[in-house]
Amino acid sequence: MAAAFDPSGRLPDLFTSAGTSSFSAFLSMAAPELLPGRRPLPPGTAADLTPHATTIVAIAAAGGVVMAGDRRATMGNLIAQRDIEKVYPADAYSLVGMAGAAGIGIELIRLFQVELEHYEKIEGAMLSLDGKANRLAAMVRGNLGAAMQGLAVVPMFAGFDLAANDPVKAGRIFSFDVTGGPYEETGYDAVGSGSLFAKSALKKRFRVGLSVDDAMRLAVEALYDAADDDTATGGPDLTRRIYPVVMTVTAEGTHRLTEAETAAIAENVVAGRMENPGG
């Protein structure tokens, strides 16, 4: 139940009492209508009313994880946006990407970022990587009603595990289903409409112990292959200079490649495909 309005201007007791370290749990008591998936929807499907985002790939490398996403959003058979961003830092040592209903997905990611920051401020420490994945799973589960009407969001989460015994193997990847089930993946994963083709490419080229640089190129290669067969996935657009978003997370934290760095990788991939279209 939402907090009652006080005509005196005082904050409701809910805002001044000791509460939970979960911001989304607080919001569910203070203003539940603001949570993704909590707004009432009319009967029927709404899948064609919003842009949908795909495809995201993640690759475990020596000492971290690489996550990359294409830039295309579609509405049915139309390209709704050519330069949407689908990969973001969740906090200092983790990344999150999303596929599905773009508006809800971006809102979910922003709420997740606030959730992790709120926990750290209240508890004075970071959540464990498993704890972060479980918090994200709960948020995805909260959107199940909207997902049943076509507005599904499926995130991908990856991070550097500060508690790992071996820093070289500290990069971990988590996938989720539409009901919020979290699953840890080994080596690599992909999500979105082009994920079938991206994972097929990763399966052939992935090797345990890849360097971060090699994993970045492999991620762009996988997105190129996905775009080659999936109309909802956009490949490197050399004409408009629109390239995939590529991010890394290592012991030094998260890092987003600059446009120039991503352009260099994408142009090398395209040049290689000119000589060998099949990769």
From Swiss-Prot:
Q: What is its main location?
A: cytoplasm
**Listed SUPFAM superfamilies:** N-terminal nucleophile aminohydrolases (Ntn hydrolases) (SSF56235)
The residue range of the signal peptide is: none
* Pathway where it operates: Protein degradation; proteasomal Pup-dependent pathway
Its EC number is 3.4.25.1
Give the regulation of activity: The formation of the proteasomal ATPase ARC-20S proteasome complex, likely via the docking of the C-termini of ARC into the intersubunit pockets in the alpha-rings, may trigger opening of the gate for substrate entry. Interconversion between the open-gate and close-gate conformations leads to a dynamic regulation of the 20S proteasome proteolysis activity.
InterPro entries the record matches? Ntn_hydrolases_N, Proteasome_sua/b, Proteasome_suB-type, PSB_actinobac
Q: Which Pfam families match?
A: Proteasome
Entries under CDD domains matching the protein = proteasome_protease_HslV
Q: Which UniProt keyword terms apply here?
A: Autocatalytic cleavage, Cytoplasm, Hydrolase, Protease, Proteasome, Threonine protease, Zymogen
* Reactions the enzyme catalyzes: Cleavage of peptide bonds with very broad specificity
The keyword Zinc belongs to this UniProt entry's keyword annotation: no
One record GO biological process:
modification-dependent protein catabolic process
Got a GO cellular component term for this one?
proteasome core complex, beta-subunit complex
Q: Which residues form the propeptide?
A: 1-53
Q: Which residues form the active site?
A: 54
Where does it localize? Cytoplasm
The record's note on quaternary structure and interaction partners says: The 20S proteasome core is composed of 14 alpha and 14 beta subunits that assemble into four stacked heptameric rings, resulting in a barrel-shaped structure. The two inner rings, each composed of seven catalytic beta subunits, are sandwiched by two outer rings, each composed of seven alpha subunits. The catalytic chamber with the active sites is on the inside of the barrel. Has a gated structure, the ends of the cylinder being occluded by the N-termini of the alpha-subunits. Is capped by the proteasome-associated ATPase, ARC.
Describe the function of this protein: Component of the proteasome core, a large protease complex with broad specificity involved in protein degradation.
Its protein name is Proteasome subunit beta
Q: State the organism of origin.
A: Salinispora arenicola (strain CNS-205)
Question: Gene encoding it?
Answer: prcB
